[in-house]
């Protein structure tokens, strides 16, 4: 425990909280351009080919973002909206692409959880 004199001399430093999505620079989403669309394999107990895209954001960062849902239309030079949110079994993937906005179309034939995949209500 510091003495009162020590606290007067050197005030306590506030604990700085570190953001989990630094590339967004405090914004809820950021626009970016795909530079590469490819698949990667997940960490140990899981096995799949997860779809990801390398995205150059308007903030100047180059990030890896996950493409959620079954099937997508993204390719190089596609303009996408990126939100925070990591993928637990993909190391280094800390962002998600928002489906149903800009060049990323919604998931085809999606019935449940439609709002997360940019799908309008079926007639």
Swiss-Prot record:
Taxonomic superkingdom: Eukaryota
Record's keyword terms, sorted: Chloroplast, Plastid, Ribonucleoprotein, Ribosomal protein, RNA-binding, rRNA-binding
CDD domains assigned: Ribosomal_S12 (cd03368)
BP-aspect Gene Ontology terms: translation
InterPro entries in UniProt: NA-bd_OB-fold (IPR012340), Ribosomal_uS12 (IPR006032), Ribosomal_uS12_bac (IPR005679)
Annotated localization: Plastid, Chloroplast
Cellular component annotations (GO), alphabetically ordered: chloroplast; small ribosomal subunit
Single GO molecular function: structural constituent of ribosome
PROSITE patterns: RIBOSOMAL_S12
Pfam families: Ribosom_S12_S23
Protein family membership: Belongs to the universal ribosomal protein uS12 family.
Function of the molecule: With S4 and S5 plays an important role in translational accuracy. Located at the interface of the 30S and 50S subunits.
Subunit structure: Part of the 30S ribosomal subunit.
PANTHER family: 30S RIBOSOMAL PROTEIN S12 FAMILY MEMBER
Protein name per UniProt: Small ribosomal subunit protein uS12cz/uS12cy
């Amino acid at each position: 425990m510091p003495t009162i004199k020590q606290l007067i001399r050197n005030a306590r430093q506030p604990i700085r909280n570190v953001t989990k999505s630094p590339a967004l620079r405090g914004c809820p989403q950021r626009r970016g351009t795909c530079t590469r669309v490819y698949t990667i394999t997940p960490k140990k107990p899981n096995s799949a080919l997860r779809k990801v895209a390398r995205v150059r954001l308007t903030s100047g960062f180059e990030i890896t973002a996950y493409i959620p849902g079954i099937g997508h239309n993204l390719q190089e030079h596609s303009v996408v909206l990126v939100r925070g949110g990591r993928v637990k079994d993909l190391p280094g993937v800390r962002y998600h692409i928002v489906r149903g906005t800009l060049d990323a179309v919604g998931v085809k034939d999606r019935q449940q959880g439609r709002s997360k995949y940019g799908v309008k209500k079926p007639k």
